[in-house]
């Protein structure tokens, strides 16, 4: 496949990618609701879209366009389920922890970015928050009321789904199917239609996060923020909108309805949806209490091993989690690092390697809807050929330079699964790094047991001895984490 093709969830076909505006590709990805620490499901989504953005930038360098990437932070308005009823998730967490809702949001926002940084996920160009864009959301609601697509009822504002002919076109869900699915649509007496969704909610007594609006004190509905912020920073029509497959309905269908009703223009050209992480075939999630906290995983595995594990499956394929599966990925990750180190340290020889053929195969894989598992498979074909050449006659200067460039460009810059050259040449091998992770997991468990039995002397001694050796322990609500102190 010579040019980039993207699977469009709306048309259910692969389509050639061409930005709307010459010189600029725009992408919006639904960000996290910050009421808890990130888990492996978040990692799959944001690592997958990180590669999407990296590859777009790689292609854009050749085709003359830049990429503007927006990923929001939902810090208000996401209810405890997808219906219009229930308690705001952040407010609920604040009540449980007996702190201010914004303290919850900011604490878990910092935690989210810490985890993404360790996974090598690059920051978006713009990371807007819902609470920082209340005026824009109110303005969008006013436009929808003026155009007859929304109505106020008892301080609430609802989108009239019957006013928008294309409602449900992304998921293919009908209003009747939505009603029969259970839990997705709440039936209220102040709605014209049970399927109408909330744009603005009246704040009940005791609701903490609320703002003044033309309809009284209230707060925005879950779906509103993404439309308002995407259009503010990327325009009425954006190139790519990404998110989890579970967000097709109702979230993305509602985004389409309210955005296109307001502007009269197509909201998104290419819809992309990543699949879920499963545990024994069941979706991972906080509500099912089967999620795996990233901070806990980082205590057992190098974060880049987890990234490598994620990218060995296609973003549209489910990823079944087990520690055994990550350990299996670890050997491949270590081989990648060791081969790169061997290449850099190798003496100049006489052998040649057809690097360009491997580069083209990797390019073709990534141009085929960002097919990372095929790209990684080709990378290991290259590693096999490279090691064979190094075993035989070594590589001449041109082949060695080309091989290093392939590693740097594709394994490093695009896939993000290659440690830096300085780290590899000066640091530990993958095996010794994993040994350190294993030892630290044991020490943190011993310290946890000491604290539980109120043996604070032992707990503090473990912490202090590790600190002397350049390892810092940080106690969080979810347990202790560790990191090496920067020199």
Curated annotation (Swiss-Prot):
Cofactor needs: Zn(2+)
Reactions catalysed according to its record: tRNA(Cys) + L-cysteine + ATP = L-cysteinyl-tRNA(Cys) + AMP + diphosphate
Motif window: 'HIGH' region: 32-42
Ligand binding (ATP): 286
Record note on cofactor: Binds 1 zinc ion per subunit.
Compartments it resides in: Cytoplasm
Entry GO terms, CC: cytosol
Family stated for the protein in its record: Belongs to the class-I aminoacyl-tRNA synthetase family.
Quaternary organization: Monomer.
Protein name: Cysteine--tRNA ligase
Gene this protein is translated from: cysS
């Amino acid at each position: 496949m010579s040019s980039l093709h993207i699977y469009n969830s709306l048309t259910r076909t692969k389509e050639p990618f061409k930005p709307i505006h010459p010189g600029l590709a725009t992408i919006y990805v639904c960000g996290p609701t910050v009421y808890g620490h990130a888990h492996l499901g978040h990692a799959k989504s944001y690592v997958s879209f990180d590669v999407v953005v990296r590859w777009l930038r790689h292609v854009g360098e050749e085709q003359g366009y830049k990429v503007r990437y927006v990923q929001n932070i939902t810090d208000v308005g996401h209810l405890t389920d997808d219906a219009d009823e229930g308690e705001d998730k952040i407010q609920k967490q604040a009540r449980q922890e007996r702190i201010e809702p914004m303290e919850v949001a900011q604490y878990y926002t910092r935690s989210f970015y810490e985890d993404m940084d360790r996974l090598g996920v690059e920051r978006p160009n713009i990371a807007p928050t819902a609470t920082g864009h209340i005026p824009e959301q109110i303005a969008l609601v006013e436009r929808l009321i003026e155009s007859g697509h929304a109505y106020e009822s008892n301080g609430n504002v609802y989108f009239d789904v019957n006013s928008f002919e294309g409602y449900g076109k992304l998921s293919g869900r009908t209003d009747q199917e939505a009603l029969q699915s259970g839990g997705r649509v709440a039936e209220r007496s102040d709605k014209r239609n049970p399927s109408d969704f909330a744009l603005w909610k009246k704040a009940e007594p005791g609701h903490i996060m609320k703002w003044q609006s033309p309809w009284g004190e209230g707060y925005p509905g879950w779906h509103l923020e993404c439309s308002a912020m995407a259009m503010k920073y990327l325009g009425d029509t954006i190139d790519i909108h990404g998110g989890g497959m579970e967000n097709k309905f109702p979230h993305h269908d509602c985004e389409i309805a309210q955005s296109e009703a307001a502007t009269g223009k197509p909201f998104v050209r290419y819809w992309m949806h990543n699949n879920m992480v499963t545990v024994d075939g069941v979706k991972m999630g906080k509500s099912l209490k089967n999620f795996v906290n990233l901070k806990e995983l980082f205590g057992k595995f190098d974060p880049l091993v987890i990234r490598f594990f994620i990218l060995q499956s296609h973003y549209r394929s489910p990823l079944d989690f087990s520690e055994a599966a990550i350990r299996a990925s670890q050997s491949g990750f270590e081989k990648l690092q060791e081969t790169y180190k061997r290449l850099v340290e190798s003496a100049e020889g006489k052998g040649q390697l057809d690097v360009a053929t491997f580069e083209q195969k990797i390019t073709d894989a990534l141009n085929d809807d960002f097919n990372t598992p095929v790209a990684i498979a080709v990378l290991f074909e290259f590693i096999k050929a490279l090691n064979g050449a190094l075993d035989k006659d070594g590589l001449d200067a041109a082949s060695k330079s080309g091989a290093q460039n392939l590693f740097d460009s594709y394994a490093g810059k695009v896939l993000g699964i290659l440690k830096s050259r300085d780290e590899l040449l000066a640091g530990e091998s993958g095996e010794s790094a994993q040994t350190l992770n294993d030892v630290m997991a044991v020490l943190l468990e011993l310290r946890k047991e000491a604290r539980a039995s109120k043996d604070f002397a032992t707990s503090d001694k473990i912490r202090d001895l590790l600190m002397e050796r350049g390892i810092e322990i940080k106690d969080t609500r979810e347990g202790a984490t560790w990191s090496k102190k920067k020199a």
